[in-house]
């Protein structure tokens, strides 16, 4: 089982390797860091200029791979390796390497302008996340931990994609001996005094959402009970806030937590095509996020 890590040249943030090694300690596997450098033009007209560029790129690749090996050496219990490849597209190169390595997960870091402890997708990472056929784990900037994965929170919407996600994450939690938390996020404005028909209707709609979420979570509990989960290792939460950031902050988050989100329920392709809710959850998540592709109906009781 292989974790392929995107590791950029002159990387000053080893968060992706840190997360990959944490995952590899929890669900055992090897970590393969891949640095992607620009590819030459490959045309006769380029001549010596192209050769000079390729020599420069090779030097950058060797340097980056050496830096990745140094970072991997900080995790002696994890089997690690580092390579560099040349390509015109970083997402394409990482997906190629994932296919070649038969990787079960890609791991990437956040954009260089992300706040420390937060996730922000660069344009390259965004394209990767939306096109990958395998799960993509995203580390917050500056991520460091000595803990294994101790709890996975599933963003649960009670649609086919969520049930598929729940089934896959339940299996991973068993393998990692991690707790599982099923969380439904409800974003609604603060309640106002019922002084008009519109505000009364708004209150009724929010209450209906929460009742539906509670019913769906009871159904999820029945399914998870059948998969061997017991009370100490299983949690349920409905987190409500006036915006996504505050809804997510309603939950407690600890070192060792991972948040899992699924692909859009309406997208026809088995890829990590994130809907607006998953994208916002990623933006405000205070812990690493795993985006999981697929919208199969497995797991529904």
PLM region spans:
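Short beta-strand elements of ligand-binding domains
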Residues: 107-110, 135-142, 289-293
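Active-site phosphate/pyrophosphate- and oxyanion-stabilizing loops and adjacent acidic/basic residues
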Residues: 21, 70, 95, 126, ...
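Structural beta-alpha unit
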Residues: 12, 55, 70-106, 225-259, ...
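Solvent-exposed polar/charged
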Residues: 22-25, 99-100, 130, 174, ...
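Glycine-rich, Arg-bearing micro-motifs that act as flexible, cationic patches
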Residues: 105-127, 149, 243, 258-284
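Small/aliphatic-rich secondary-structure junction motif
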Residues: 1-51, 77-80, 151-206, 227-235, ...
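A short acidic, glycine-rich active-site loop
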Residues: 51-63, 202-215
């Amino acid at each position: 089982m292989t974790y392929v890590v995107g590791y950029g040249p002159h990387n000053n943030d080893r968060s992706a390797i840190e997360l990959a090694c944490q995952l590899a300690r929890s669900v055992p596997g090897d970590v393969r860091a891949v640095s992607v450098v620009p590819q030459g033009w490959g045309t006769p007209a380029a001549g010596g200029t192209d050769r000079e560029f390729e020599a420069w790129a090779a030097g950058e690749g060797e340097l980056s791979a050496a830096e990745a090996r140094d970072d991997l050496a900080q995790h002696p219990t994890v089997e690690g390796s580092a390579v560099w490849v040349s390509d015109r597209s970083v997402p394409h190169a990482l997906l190629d390497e994932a296919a070649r390595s038969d990787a079960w997960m890609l791991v990437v870091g956040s954009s260089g302008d992300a706040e420390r402890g937060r996730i922000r997708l660069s344009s390259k990472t965004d394209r990767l996340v939306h096109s990958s056929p395998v799960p993509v784990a995203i580390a917050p900037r500056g991520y460091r931990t000595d803990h294994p994965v101790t709890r996975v929170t599933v963003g649960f919407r009670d649609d086919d994609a969520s049930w598929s996600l729940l089934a896959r994450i339940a299996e991973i939690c068993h393998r990692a001996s991690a707790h599982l938390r099923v969380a439904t996020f409800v974003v609604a404005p603060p309640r106002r005094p019922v002084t008009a028909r519109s505000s009364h209707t708004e209150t009724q709609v929010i209450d209906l959402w929460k009742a539906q979420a509670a019913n769906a979570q009871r159904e999820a509990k029945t399914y998870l009970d059948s998969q061997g989960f017991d009370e100490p290792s299983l949690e349920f939460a409905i987190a409500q806030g006036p915006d996504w950031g505050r809804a997510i902050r309603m939950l407690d988050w600890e070192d060792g937590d991972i948040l899992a989100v699924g692909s859009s329920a309406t997208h026809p392709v088995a890829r990590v095509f994130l809907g607006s809710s998953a994208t916002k959850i990623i933006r405000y998540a205070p812990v690493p996020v795993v985006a999981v592709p697929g919208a199969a109906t497995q797991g529904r009781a």
